[in-house]
Each structure stands twice: as C-alpha cells, then as structure tokens.
C-alpha cells in the first residue's frame, strides 16, 4: 500500500500477492544443509548472492544483504574476486547455473542463514505450514516454487504430498 500511495495509486482490496521462492521438505534426521537439500534448493538460495553481487557491482550497495549473511557475503565476494573470468565478463560466471542448478564451487555458500534470510521454505511439513500461515497473515496469497531443475519433479511432489495436502484452505 505504501508503494502504491507514493505514486498516487490505490491497490484494489483484492490485490493478489505471490512470492517466487523455494521449498524443501526435510526428511527425518536431515538438516537444512544436507546434500539432498542443497541439490533441491541450492540454485535459488544462491541466486540471492548473485543479486547482491550485481547490486554491489552497480553502485557498491550492500543494504539488501541480510545482517545474518554479512560474513557469508564477505566470503562470497572474496570467492568472486578470484574467478578466472575477467571482471568485464565475470557476470557470466557469477550467473552460471542461476536458478537452475548449484555450481559445485558455490555449494559451500548455501547455509542455514542464507536459506532463512532469503525466505526459503525449508523444514518439516509442520514448520513449512507454519511459515506459510505466517506469510498468509501478512497478506501473501500464493507461493510459486522454483526448485533446481533436475530435482523439480521429486521436490514438487514432496511439497504437494507432505505440505499442500495438509494445508488448510
């Protein structure tokens, strides 16, 4: 509403909101940074680092970097500065795998802090349902999930069977 009012517009009362995000239902005994979880959601989590890098390259802006990820950002920036690609073309290497797969050298940057800071729906079915209910209470109507492409069928099926079937509508 604030953004609309700044440009002299009024949002309709039934304004539909959707968030592009990612999800992974944890298996018993599994943690947020297990290999399977990174296989399924690493590409989307890493896209945040790519975005932060782009902003930083554009104007040095680091205001969008979550405080909980500041050390991770420093490590990632050092990692990018050692890339073989010349600075003028480095964006091509930065975005390799962007939203489709996690580049093996970047997997170490997928941390619990990054997942939480970027809104990932990662947890047990009950935890994910709670996250969805909290976001719904804030006005979110829909989530669009983007898992890593080679894991999409399994990831989306798990979400459908273990979360959506139990989510109250």
Per-region residue spans from a language model:
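An alpha-helical appendage that flanks or caps ligand/catalytic pockets
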Residues: 2-134
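C-terminal helical cap(s) of enzyme catalytic domains, especially alpha/beta-barrels
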Residues: 2-6, 152-169
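Structural motif
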Residues: 138-140
């Amino acid at each position: 509403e604030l953004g609309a009012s700044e440009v002299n517009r009024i949002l309709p009362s039934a304004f539909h909101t959707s968030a592009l995000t990612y999800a992974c239902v944890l298996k018993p005994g599994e943690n947020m940074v297990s290999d399977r979880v990174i296989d399924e959601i690493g590409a989307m989590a890493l896209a945040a680092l790519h975005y932060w890098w782009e902003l930083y390259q554009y104007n040095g802006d680091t205001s969008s970097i979550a405080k909980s990820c500041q050390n991770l950002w420093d490590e990632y920036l050092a990692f990018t500065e050692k890339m073989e690609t010349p600075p003028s073309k480095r964006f091509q290497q930065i975005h390799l795998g962007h939203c489709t797969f996690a580049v093996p050298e970047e997997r170490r940057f997928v941390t619990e802090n990054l997942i939480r800071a970027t809104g990932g729906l990662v947890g047990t079915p009950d935890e994910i349902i709670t996250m969805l209910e909290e976001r719904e209470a804030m006005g979110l109507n829909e989530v669009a999930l983007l898992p890593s492409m080679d894991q999409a069928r399994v990831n989306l099926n798990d979400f459908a069977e273990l979360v959506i079937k139990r989510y109250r509508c």
